[in-house]
Amino acid sequence: MPDLDLTLDRARLDALRHGAVVVETRPAVFRVTGSGALTCLQGLLTSDLLAPGDGALLYGAMLTPKGAIVTDAWVFRRGDAVTMVVPCEGRAAALEIFGRTLPPRLARTTDLTGEARVAWLLGDRGFQVLAKSGIGAPEGAGRIHEVGSGDGAVTVALAPETAPFAACLVGPASALEPLVARLVAAGARPGDEQDHHAARILAGWPTLGAEIEERTLPQEVRFDAIGGVSYTKGCYTGQETVARLHFRGHTNRELRGLWWRGDEPEAPNGGSRAVMSGEREVGSVRSRLAVAGRAIGLAVIRREIDPGAEVIAGGRRAMVVALPFRGDELDA
């Protein structure tokens, strides 16, 4: 994982917010097939794999029996087969869960990590660039379709409204490369993982290894707001804790935004993570994005620290803000 204390120049930020940027990554990718693939995965994922029907893209997580996130995942449903895109940090844990819970006669897992690539199309003009490229687009948000066939097929997906990207493409590297070139020819700027994480921070989206830790519960990192959990589907591993929090209680900490408003003489201290309210430590900074002396960040903070509160974060004064960010916090 790259350093999640990011610094971008203004042109790069403007491309992310108002243009189109394409970033090619190499996450863990799994394909689950078999007559019981959908049913088995429905019992593992926090999101509802069945309700959206064939051709759906959804976001969710696999949990421990006590409800903590093991890994998050983007899930692509096509017929009775499911493709899952998982952070590299979650690969080993995902394989362990699949090996322990999926009966081979019903659901078979193929690890495509290293062979498959994912291209993320970021920015407000992402959809326009996809349309101009001639690659083809699904029928609507949260839907997928395939380009090509057989071993060279690439899945193209339009993101749900809250996602930190406009579209994504998943497929073998040899098939994905010419499609990425078409996106660039249509106006997308080639980017890297810093752009990918900057878009995630702007959207208030958590990532494994930063906002999501070993004991993180889905509701602590905005899974309700970003469509990562269903309260109407059947049982799944860890559901009891998730449902109890939703219907009867609340979390003690939540993912919130931080805004260093540029009135301090120095940028936030990259060596400090503590968020202080008076003399009390109330949370920690997990990701930061700085542009021309201004900065925003994601922090996991005690729930009683409301948006609008002034805190000391990274050794500098900051304001707690609701997520996602409005979009103008980094403006000059």
PLM regions: where:
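Short, conserved charged micro-motifs
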Residues: G36-L41, R91-L95, G126-A131, S174-R182, ...
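Residue-level signal for inorganic ion chemistry
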Residues: G34, M84-V86, L121-G123, L169, ...
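Acidic, proline/glycine-enriched N-terminal capping motif
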Residues: M1-V70
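Short amphipathic beta-strand starts and helix->beta connectors
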Residues: L8-H18, G60-D72, L102-R105, V147-A157, ...
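Catalytic strand-loop segment that frames the active site of acyl-thioester-processing enzymes
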Residues: D14-V21, A199-I226
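Glycine-rich, small/acidic residue-mixed loop/short-helix segments
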Residues: E214-L217, V221-V229, K233-Q239, A243-A332
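Helix-rich terminal scaffold detector
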Residues: Q194, A203, E211, G327-A332
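Acidic, low-complexity central loop/insert segments
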Residues: A20-V23, A28-V29, W74-P206
